[in-house]
């Protein structure tokens, strides 16, 4: 439903195996706890309900060497943001360093799984750069990348785009129509639409973004100015808004009443 959810779903791992294991020993503290050997391989984010510690997220660059799963260990001083943060953690700068573990777990679940695409969404003001890397770490569903090493845009209409490999003359088709997707068994639908950012005759290189969903990405902050990367996009984390919070008897615990009317 969102690029972030796609990235976090692809990086989810569990110690219980492909079909799961419901024996009591698979839910022990030794399985749920965070071990020092996980540093540089797994992020600290996990669910805060019954899945705590059972389902985990790999970091952006987990250092997996091959399909067998062999991992190259690194010393703590050799680690950087890519080796330390999962995608959600990298999209929440400063929070992961200062929040308590329970708040971090809540942020992971609520940010990656409950986030919705809205028209007035914008990138974060303070980032680690992960919001700009996200389009290249996910599929073409929300940001379509050029699949050829060298290519040229042959045709652009309101419904489709055609890209041609300059060497082999192979063509790639990009659907620009509005598509409707269902939220699995959640019972509601979302719409996505890729809008082109290239013109007929424009030359492209591999992984150049040619079209993107404007609800998911934008270049509104930082990378859209003069001299910036014309293909540079940032993930829209949410709506930037000024909010006034007043504690009254209408609130419950850490909740508050929300109204469209502004005073």
Task: Outline where the language-model segments fall.
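Long, charge-dense accessory insertions within large macromolecular proteins
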Residues: 1-48, 52-202, 206-262
